[in-house]
Amino acid sequence: MNAPALSPARRTKKLPPLRVGIGGPVGSGKTTLLEMLCKAMRERYDLVAITNDIYTKEDQRLLTVAGALPEERIMGVETGGCPHTAIREDASINLEAVDRMLSRFPDADIVFIESGGDNLAATFSPELSDLTIYVIDVAGGEKIPRKGGPGITKSDLLVINKTDLAPLVGANLDVMASDTKKMRGERPYVMTNLKALEGVADVVAFIEKKGLLMV
């Protein structure tokens, strides 16, 4: 039996919750970004998080162990198939997860939804996500921005993570920045070293400004 959807009468805040989708390839730093965002924003905003894995709930466990949010505010979804499908073509499993979390926490300000690791073609359904953040990492090589794909060209914010690894993999950050601007036009991007918290404040500021949380 499906969990009940959020009842509008239970929500006391005027604005609906902001749904932020976080996507990107396996190992790019999606879960780390989600952890850092939760820790940076939890004192000011009411947060819940939903993670996607194909056959496990490992990302949910990692966030819980890291103390990103209280355990009851983190839900793991086992998609059992292509992670792209679960956030785009048939997002019903995630839409139901959002409803379940909002039935528990009706005054949530932000619902973070982390996709399972996927390729550069992954995008979020507009029914599921209001803002999309796509994470790639320098370890994949400086060519990654040039490869394009909806995640790189159409996401609301592109995060280029693991900048500290550039010297180790022979990647030129200036080239990556230039290619990113060519591929994205005026759409913003942030270079980060999430383990050192570098760039996290910029991502938070983007969410607050673009999501109108500061109004």
Swiss-Prot record:
Belongs to the SIMIBI class G3E GTPase family. UreG subfamily. Facilitates the functional incorporation of the urease nickel metallocenter. This process requires GTP hydrolysis, probably effectuated by UreG. GTP binds at G24, P25, V26, G27, S28, G29, K30, T31. Homodimer. UreD, UreF and UreG form a complex that acts as a GTP-hydrolysis-dependent molecular chaperone, activating the urease apoprotein by helping to assemble the nickel containing metallocenter of UreC. The UreE protein probably delivers the nickel. It is found in: Cytoplasm. The gene is ureG. This is Urease accessory protein UreG. GO terms for cellular component: cytoplasm. InterPro entries: CobW/HypB/UreG_nucleotide-bd (IPR003495), P-loop_NTPase (IPR027417), UreG (IPR004400). The keyword Cytoplasm applies. Pfam families: cobW. GO terms for molecular function: GTP binding; GTPase activity; nickel cation binding. Its main location: cytoplasm. Keywords: Chaperone, Cytoplasm, GTP-binding, Nickel insertion, Nucleotide-binding. GO terms for biological process: urea catabolic process.
